[in-house]
Amino acid sequence: MDATPNAVELTVDNAWFIAETIGAGTFPWVLAITMPYSDAAQRGAFVDRQRDELTRMGLLSPQGVINPAVADWIKVVCFPDRWLDLRYVGPASADGACELLRGIVALRTGTGKTSNKTGNGVVALRNAQLVTFTAMDIDDPRALVPILGVGLAHRPPARFDEFSLPTRVGARADERLRSGVPLGEVVDYLGIPASARPVVESVFSGPRSYVEIVAGCNRDGRHTTTEVGLSIVDTSAGRVLVSPSRAFDGEWVSTFSPGTPFAIAVAIQTLTACLPDGQWFPGQRVSRDFSTQSS
């Protein structure tokens, strides 16, 4: 049996210590994993504590060597070739606070595999003081769909007619809602289709969880991220996808559509194509095929 793990759960202190020990660099900002002490005098006790914990977990050898698989995953997360930043927000609790989950899908290109052959990607998800690293083979945008929905409420796709709004109009609507304008009045102002009104109202007035996704790449030593991101929103009326596109005049437009797995895969493909390195999965493009429809 292959004893190489494909996932590990660490404290954020464990993760920071491993990254420093192996020289992996810093973690992406989205994970918010930073130096756990502010006084150099605290370092000795911190290092001893981490070594004890990782040794008990079987991740640190008596010679002080970090488990090679875990070390490789952390290197991928700290210095990916391509990535998706994930910021999840859950329904507000009784005290008004929202549950927050942070994550990143980190991909390596070139050979297509990490050195321990567990996959070409690593998914890191942080919840409070714990962070989970999972090695995965990701070679198709459709493989990303269940990953992106992991922190959501797993609602079925909402049923409504797709519609689009200029991003600036949506931003203006948000401002009006925050200033106290009734939701119904704002929905009228936006001219939202009748079939979509209950869904839009559930987004703003009911319990919801959502993930905001931004893509990035490292090409020729330069880090680039997309100007805009896409969102997947789970509401009492179902799952809604909010995806960006650029109009002919250069203005960004947000399209609201039922959050089907296919639609999400297409949106991921479109978002990542905005980056300098183009299509992430050129051999696995997903698109609507109207060729078999009768005229």
Swiss-Prot record:
This is ESX-3 secretion-associated protein EspG3. Belongs to the EspG family. Keywords: Chaperone, Cytoplasm. InterPro entries: EspG (IPR025734). It holds the Pfam family ESX-1_EspG. GO terms for cellular component: cytoplasm. Specific chaperone for cognate PE/PPE proteins. Plays an important role in preventing aggregation of PE/PPE dimers. It comes from the Bacteria.
